[in-house]
A protein has these predicted regions:
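Polybasic, glycine- and aromatic-enriched phosphate-binding surface used to engage nucleic acids
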Residues: 1-200
Length: 200
């Protein structure tokens, strides 16, 4: 649900108004209200200034993503979406034709395994959906020309897997190594060279 325009995420230039609990965005000539409780910061470098980051770049994003899941990674039920998040539900429903999975409608375009008529708005991929929620992490640029192991302490979501270009690394429970140490070790040119050799 990325082309021609993304559905789940938007940038700050699309926000036309902001209120205590909602933002109003402009999409396809219409304005939509999105509840802030379902929004998470989203790392997806699309502008020149956002690209070419390295390990010690300060991560910042002007993008937010609709995250219709609870902290355990369970999809928020459709009745709760309708009653507690009516603006977001109306927005997603307005884009039903682009979101409906193939297994729900023969007109569907997305591959979403196990989707039903009541879960049509779920993400196509859900692996590691909550693995890094409320967890400091390194965002790793998989296809970066320069080493990129950027520290994230702001709970930024990333697209990972496939050709997304990013994955995340967090400190293992019980590890004696601080995340900053892991970042420095991974960013070392010798370590990077070893990873290049092993990875090719």
């Amino acid at each position: 649900a990325e082309r021609p325009t993304p559905i789940y995420w938007f940038s700050s230039d699309e926000i036309v108004a902001e209120y205590a609990d909602t933002v109003e965005i402009s999409r396809d000539g219409n304005n939509y209200t999105i509840e802030k409780a379902l929004l998470r910061p989203y790392f997806k470098p699309t502008k020149k200034a956002e690209k070419g980051l390295n390990s010690y770049s300060i991560l910042a994003t002007d993008k937010q993503i609709i995250f219709p899941y609870d902290n355990n990674g369970h999809l928020i039920r459709i009745d709760e979406m309708q009653s507690s998040y009516p603006g977001t539900y109306a927005y997603l429903l307005a884009h039903y034709d682009r979101l409906v999975p193939k297994c729900v409608s023969r007109d569907g375009t997305r591959d979403v395994p196990n989707a039903t008529a009541d879960t049509w708005y779920q993400y196509g991929r859900t692996q590691a959906l909550t693995a890094f929620i409320n967890t400091p992490k390194l965002i790793v640029g998989v296809l970066s020309k320069e080493p990129m192991y950027a520290m994230d302490t702001n709970d930024i979501l990333i697209a990972s897997g496939g050709t997304a270009g990013y994955c995340a690394v967090s400190k293992k429970d019980g590890s004696p190594y601080a995340l900053e140490y892991i970042q420095a070790w991974l960013s070392n040119p010798i370590t990077e060279r070893i990873l290049e050799i092993v990875g090719s």
